[in-house]
Amino acid sequence: MTPKYPKYAYIEPTIKSKKKSLLIIGSKTYKQSTVDAMVEEAEKKFDEVLFAPIDKIQIQTSEGKASLFYKGKNLLSFNAIYPRISSRDFLLGEAVMKAIEKSNAYCPVTLDSYQVSNHKFYTSQKLSGQGVPGVLSTLSISPKYADYAVNETGYPFVMKLISGFAGKGVVLINSKEQMESILDAIHLFEEFICTQKFIKGKDSDVRCYVVGDYVIAIKRKSKKGDWRANVSRGGSAMPINPTPEMLEIAKNSAKILGMDICAVDLMEQKNKWVVIEVNFMPGPFRKYLGTMVVHEWIRFLADYTEKKMEKHFQKGHAKQI
């Protein structure tokens, strides 16, 4: 007697379209030239590309699930989402990042990485806890405790506002008198303060753009009369070949913080490289690197999205009938 075997029907994968789509979310004060460069490059790799400023995005919550809309379009329907949200938009940014994290879209950064990287002290704390070399840092909430911190760093030292970016909110303190006058002003705004040991004799640093396993390095030099090696503040820059030590520190920092795309700023201290800070939404330095960084961002997003989609299409399954 021939045994009866159950019949099976093939169930198609849940994804209906093979079209690749990319959403880029920008801050309220986004740089138009950077957006244009990213969109132009993305249109070569993706079938659909959309840029949405965060202040124009509508967030809806229903039954514990958040949705994002821009001009009536469901933003969580995109295959890939690259949020470039600054600390200025932190509260709204957290809500947007949380919604993205619960969607099926690929995102090269996480809610946790957004929260930590926008808090300079927490960044240092998390990295140092995993053995990544960094600069001696302290967190203070009052002039009194900032004064105690100086006993560890000594003068001069670097003072950073937690919410600062692009070299803003960063001051070199050379004396107790200077510190006290600045702290009095900061205390009026109830700002948290991160202090870091100043590395003397260094007028340059290295920014490592981490894009997956690939790293682009650029050496930044401060302008004359300014100790900050920040191009947005008038400094200069040039591409370099990263050393194995730079590569290891940059990649490890990105991995610990949960970012596939970011920038890790390094400075040399006692013949060793240390992390100064990690940037969640770095500028592409097009003046010095052309479209190199933008190209790598988009290439990585497109390749990762394609691989993820292929896995979904291959996940058809058999169901007994």
Please place each PLM-identified region on the residue numbering.
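Short glycine-rich anion-binding loops that position phosphate/pyrophosphate groups of nucleotides
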Residues: S86-R88, S163-G164, M281
